[in-house]
Amino acid sequence: MANTKSASSAAKNKKPAAKPEKKAPAEELVKEEKVLVEAAAATAAPEAPAPEVKEEAPAAPIEVVAPETEAPQEEPAPEIKVEEKKKILFVASEAAPFIATGGLAEVIGSLSKALAKEDRYDVRAIIPLYQDIKKEYRKDFRFIGNIFVPLSWRNQYCGIFEYVKDNVTFYFVDNEYYFKRPGCYGYYDDGERFAFFCRSVMEILGFLNFYPDILHCHDWQAALAAIYLKTIYCFRPEYQFIRAVFTIHNIEYQGQYSLDILEDLFGISYRYQYLVEYDRCINLMKGAIECCEQFTTVSPTYAGEIKDPYYSHGLDPIVRRNEFKLCGILNGIDPDYYNPETDRALFANYNAEDTAGKAVCKEELQRMLNLPVKPETPIIAMITRLVSHKGLDLVKEVIEQALRQDIQFVLLGTGDSMYENYFSDLARRYQGKVVSIISFNSDLSRKIYSGADIFLMPSKSEPCGLSQMIASRYGTVAIVRETGGLRDSISPYGAGGNGFTFHDYNAYDMLYVINEAIGVYHNKDEWKRLMYKAMTTDFTWAKSAKYYEGLYLGMLMH
């Protein structure tokens, strides 16, 4: 209560607040401001006199100039991004022109060259450094280093050589224990030799710091490269984006070995046995089919045939299971090498427009082989390996009936002793009509291609075949059985095609077509037209390479 009273009495005794003082008159304020301004001016720099203002006509619109520091800079030219070349590496057991035992070498040499002509690709190839590689090339190989390659429990020396040809970089894997031997194949330890080769390929990529976009492996000898990529190297970051393609050149040769050596010799863990096991053994071709992103064959027809037990040599279930990633691309030939207009091995040169030189080639071939020089007599030629699937049993059955006509027969090749002996005996019994040369020589083969009139190729199976293309290129009309690449490259005369064909594997069907071809041969105008058709058929790699480009680019998009 006391506190309340004192508070109220204080409120009563409180004086009202004082009113604000009146402002000074305006004159006094102006005077005070003038004094302050004069004091400031005394300490400042003297001010420049104000410019005299003159009345002028209305000025034009004033151009506003940005400060110098804000002047717009000239835009730099847009940066042109150069697309990095796609990197392609071919892995194979042979390559032309260094060493060749068959069509595989031609494919590696010619396909790589065709792709390298496109500036979009960095194309390289790798093969073993065999003892028999041609000295004319080997002397220029450049040694670029060596590594030690892990092969299961051991490390093996690997030398690396390099050679550039036709814009393709070739690498050669050197190990004298494995490769300093005559020839390429046929040794008891071929499995170990090519396991070392494939493991070396994968290690060399790291040594070169070259990780291809496409790893293209060919036949069973290179199959382990695709298998190693899937089972060992895909876990390394540099290898993760490599895409593997596997090409079957001949499904008959699959690389089959005992399961016991999977880990001890090949260095592959048994947990991956399911990838390579087939019919209770290691099957390297099966393993490559399972491990690659795409697999191909060397002709569209052969791609269909290998799904059939008749052609697949037991592998058709694997092919059918993986057919979603299978395609067939027809091989080609090198038009620069196989060119009758420039080929120095020929007795005379010619082309599709002027075939006079071919008549000279025929006459000189007859002289060289000690055959009667008879321009009107057709020469039927075979250049082949002497093995059963080349249709030689058909030839044996009807050749003597064909020889009753006015023809000459020339054979060049080596192979099974049974066929070598048969054709050698045939030449002895038909002297002046038959010549059998049991050997092989590239220059001689081109002399025969150019000097013969008809080329006989009645194969039981033929994944692609190059001989029928080469013969056609030289104006020698082909007779083929409709199988594999023969069907894809030679079309029947009766349908306006570039050769003669028969469907069933039957000797008398073949004899009928031989007689048909001989009949057309004696109609010179019609034969000349058929020769022109054969010589102008496009068998070049340029066309085939386009299909491979499409395959590669499709893989890289996924």
Features from the language model and the residues they span:
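N-terminal intrinsically disordered, low-complexity tails
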Residues: 9-68
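Catalytic cores of nucleotide-sugar-dependent glycosyltransferases that transfer UDP/GDP/TDP-activated
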Residues: 2-15, 19, 23, 61-558
